[in-house]
Design a protein with these regions (language model features):
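Accessory RNA-recognition modules of RNA-modification enzymes
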Residues: 1-172
Length: 172
C-alpha cells in the first residue's frame, strides 16, 4: 500500500463503465473521469475515487481537481476527437513530505489554467512544486515540452538511504 511516488492520472470526457455497471441495465450519465487508462485502450479511462498506490494528499488533490473542473465547466479530454482543456495530472510525493503536481492542459487558456492552479495552491499548502504543461499534440508524451513552474520550487527532494535527490518534473 502507498508504494508509488509518481502517478499519472488522465482526464476523459466519458468515464469507462465496468462490466457490472453495463450489465445492471441502469442508464448512466456520460460523466467525465479522472483516473487510469484501461489496459490496451488509449481512449478509455476508469474514474478513480480512492487510490491506494500513493499517500495523501494525492487522493484529495485528484478529487478536488475533478470537482473544481466539473463545477467550473472545464472540458475533459476526448482522445478520439482531440479536444478538451484537461488532459493529464501527475502527482509526485516524496518521503520528505514534499509534493509536486503537474497539470497538463490541451489548450493554452491562461485564464482557466491560472484559476485551477491558484485554487490548488490555495487549498493544498502541501504542494511545494506546482507546474503546468500545454500539450496540443495528438499524443500524451510531454518529454519534448517545457513544464512551467507556476508556484513553488522547480523540484522536490527525495531522501533514500541517507542520500538526497532533486526530482524535477521530467525526472524518470
Amino acid at each position: 500500500r502507498f508504494y508509488r511516488n509518481k502517478l499519472e492520472f488522465t482526464f476523459a470526457d466519458r468515464r469507462w463503465l465496468t462490466r457490472e455497471e453495463v450489465e445492471s441495465g441502469t442508464d448512466f450519465d456520460a460523466a467525465p473521469a479522472l483516473g487510469f487508462h484501461i489496459p490496451n485502450m488509449f481512449d478509455k479511462v476508469l474514474d478513480i475515487d480512492k487510490c491506494w498506490l500513493q499517500p495523501d494528499p494525492s487522493n484529495d488533490i485528484r478529487t478536488e481537481t475533478r470537482r473544481f473542473c466539473i463545477e467550473n465547466g472545464y472540458t475533459f479530454h476526448n482522445a478520439r476527437e482531440h479536444r478538451g482543456l484537461m488532459r493529464n495530472m501527475i502527482v509526485r510525493t516524496a518521503s520528505t513530505g514534499e509534493v509536486m503536481v503537474i497539470v497538463v492542459f490541451g489548450e493554452d487558456d491562461r485564464e482557466r489554467i491560472a484559476a485551477l492552479l491558484d485554487h490548488l495552491a490555495a487549498n493544498f499548502p502541501q504542494i511545494t512544486s506546482l507546474f503546468y504543461i500545454v500539450n496540443t499534440k495528438f499524443n500524451d508524451s510531454v518529454g519534448d515540452l517545457d513544464p512551467v513552474c507556476y508556484k513553488g520550487k522547480d523540484h522536490i527532494v527525495e531522501e533514500m538511504e541517507g542520500l538526497r535527490f532533486k526530482v524535477g518534473p521530467k525526472s524518470f
